[in-house]
């Protein structure tokens, strides 16, 4: 008996296409897994349930009638709650949007539906994607499937946890400064931030519009490539959308899984992203991965990107400045929460103030205040203007590095998953958790995080980040898949096969969810 929740999305797609399983069976298996473990993990804010089963049954009916369907038809998928869905609440992890049902789908959600994937539900996240631990969700934290007392990363901890807990084979996330790649690192999953503009942002509730990017979360590099192919492409509804014709990321991943894929590839190790403050086990697994790459024919080159030293400081001026503008739309007048003032006249201004005070959490308020200050008269040039100059220097550092190497690598995060509360009241410690991922967002280049082992001191996942030049996303998939193959040969299988069993009472196979 095969547990369908343990299969990759590619394997599920093959079984569905061959008629060996139905989409209803695959969907029911994952809904069963959610029911069994999500009370502990809390990856989901909303589960589609019967709607997902109806969608799956409709796809099965069309397949049975002989209709030609896409390669991913019938495969379940989870969706980060930052993305608008016209049939499920879209809260962005905030009380101010509790219960809000958008009148439209985000473009990436529409593309999922057009490709006949089956949405399982919406995943938890830090409020308005502001955080690195999912502790800032208004609906409670998500827990790391490797250790339920530790964080799953953020802001997209729900999507990463859903995938690594085998509640979904695939998920969509968003990445503003590492919100896909950092959760992937600490949960043992794969996450990709595409080139800025490569995937539509229309319908993604904006945090920082010049930094946000939607991307795939999965358990394998190939699965990420397959989902990337579904969501990529130009969208006239997004003014920042690129008109590029993108190659198949899945084909790039398949090419990387072949022998010789790493021969003569130049891999740059960024000196500034592998220094003090990095956990010993993270550095050890990173160095071991470099050894595997070199042993397979890659050339390892140390490169310097001096401006990366200022990336965190610049990011935490640019992001709050843009967020303070984007979040001004939550005014209680047109949609979302509305709170009347406790006393005094009920005016639009006072209702807005009362609503924002009740509806926004402390981290969101902190960043709105910081961003408003950075944009204020007399401080704009000193803070926001200077941060944008640093951003330009970082882009130049990337350009110079990519003249010497094909990809850049670093640890995806400086540490493994930390315990709940450990950094919650120390904003700087929390912000520094994104030190390796932020530069790619500031420059708009693509980045991939993939698991490279468990840290010896705590037995928790460690991730490696790959970065490529803008528009060269396919390069990440080729090199990422090649490294994944080398690592799994060394481990004797996927890293997530070593993850703890979350539910002793869960039936691993049932009449509805096994073949």
Swiss-Prot record:
Family affiliation? Belongs to the amidase family. GatA subfamily.
- Subunit architecture: Heterotrimer of A, B and C subunits.
Could you tell me which NCBIfam families the record lists for this protein?
gatA
Record's GO cellular component, any one?
glutamyl-tRNA(Gln) amidotransferase complex
Q: Which residues form the active site?
A: 80 (charge relay system), 155 (charge relay system), 179 (acyl-ester intermediate)
Job of this protein: Allows the formation of correctly charged Gln-tRNA(Gln) through the transamidation of misacylated Glu-tRNA(Gln) in organisms which lack glutaminyl-tRNA synthetase. The reaction takes place in the presence of glutamine and ATP through an activated gamma-phospho-Glu-tRNA(Gln).
The terms under GO molecular function for this entry are: ATP binding; glutaminyl-tRNA synthase (glutamine-hydrolyzing) activity
**Top EC class of this enzyme:** ligase
Enumerate the catalysed reactions: L-glutamyl-tRNA(Gln) + L-glutamine + ATP + H2O = L-glutaminyl-tRNA(Gln) + L-glutamate + ADP + phosphate + H(+)
Gene3D superfamilies referenced in this protein's UniProt entry, alphabetically: Amidase signature (AS) domain
What Pfam families does the annotation carry? Amidase
Q: Name one GO biological process term.
A: translation
Name the InterPro entries on file.
Amidase (IPR000120), Amidase_CS (IPR020556), Amidase_dom (IPR023631), AS_sf (IPR036928), GatA (IPR004412)
Give EC number(s), comma-separated.
6.3.5.7
Official protein name in the record: Glutamyl-tRNA(Gln) amidotransferase subunit A
User: Gene for this protein?
Assistant: gatA
Q: Identify the keywords attached in UniProt to this record, alphabetized.
A: ATP-binding, Ligase, Nucleotide-binding, Protein biosynthesis
């Amino acid at each position: 008996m095969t547990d369908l929740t343990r299969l990759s999305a590619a394997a599920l797609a093959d079984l569905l296409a061959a008629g060996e399983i139905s989409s209803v069976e695959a969907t029911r298996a994952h809904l069963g897994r959610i029911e069994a473990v999500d009370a502990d993990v809390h990856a989901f804010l909303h589960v589609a349930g019967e709607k997902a089963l109806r969608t799956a049954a409709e796809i099965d009916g069309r397949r049975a009638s002989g209709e030609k369907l896409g390669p991913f038809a019938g495969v379940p998928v989870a969706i980060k709650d930052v993305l608008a869905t016209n049939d499920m609440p879209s809260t962005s992890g905030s009380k101010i949007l509790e219960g809000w049902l958008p009148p439209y789908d985000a473009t990436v959600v529409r593309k999922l539906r057009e490709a006949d994937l089956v949405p399982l539900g919406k995943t938890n996240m830090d409020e308005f994607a502001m955080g690195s631990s999912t502790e800032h969700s208004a609906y409670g934290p998500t827990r790391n499937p490797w250790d339920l007392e530790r964080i799953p990363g953020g802001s997209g901890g729900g999507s990463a946890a859903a995938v690594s807990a085998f509640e979904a084979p695939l998920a969509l996330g968003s990445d503003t400064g590492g919100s896909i790649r950092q959760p992937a690192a600490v949960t043992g999953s794969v996450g990709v931030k595409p080139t800025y503009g490569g995937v539509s942002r229309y319908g993604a509730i904006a945090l920082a519009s010049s930094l946000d990017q939607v991307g795939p979360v999965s358990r394998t590099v190939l699965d990420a490539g397959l989902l990337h192919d579904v969501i990529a492409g130009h969208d006239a509804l997004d003014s920042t959308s690129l008109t590029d014709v993108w190659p198949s990321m899945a084909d790039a991943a398949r090419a990387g899984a072949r022998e010789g894929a790493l021969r003569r590839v130049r891999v740059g190790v960024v000196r500034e992203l592998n220094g003090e403050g990095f956990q010993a086990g993270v550095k050890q697994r990173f160095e071991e991965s470099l050894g595997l790459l070199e042993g397979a024919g890659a050339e390892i080159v140390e490169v310097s990107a001096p401006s990366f030293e200022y990336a965190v400081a610049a990011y935490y001026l640019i992001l709050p400045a843009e967020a303070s503008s984007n979040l001004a739309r939550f005014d209680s007048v047109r949609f979302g929460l509305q709170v009347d003032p406790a006393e005094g006249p009920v005016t639009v201004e006072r209702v807005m103030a009362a609503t924002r005070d009740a509806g926004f959490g402390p981290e969101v308020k902190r960043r709105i205040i910081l961003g408003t200050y950075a944009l204020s008269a007399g401080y704009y040039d000193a803070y926001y203007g200077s941060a944008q100059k640093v951003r330009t220097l970082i882009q130049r550092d990337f350009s110079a590095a990519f003249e010497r190497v094909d990809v850049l690598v670093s640890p995806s995060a400086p540490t493994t998953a930390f315990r709940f509360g450990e950094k919650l009241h120390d904003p700087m410690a929390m912000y520094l958790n994104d030190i390796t991922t932020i530069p790619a967002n500031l420059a708009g280049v693509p980045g991939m995080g993939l698991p490279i082992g468990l840290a010896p001191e705590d037995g928790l996942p460690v991730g490696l980040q790959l970065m490529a030049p803008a528009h060269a996303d396919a390069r990440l998939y080729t090199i990422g898949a090649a490294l994944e193959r080398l690592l799994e040969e060394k481990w004797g299988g996927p890293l997530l096969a070593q993850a703890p069993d979350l539910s002793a009472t869960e039936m691993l196979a049932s009449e509805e969810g096994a073949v």
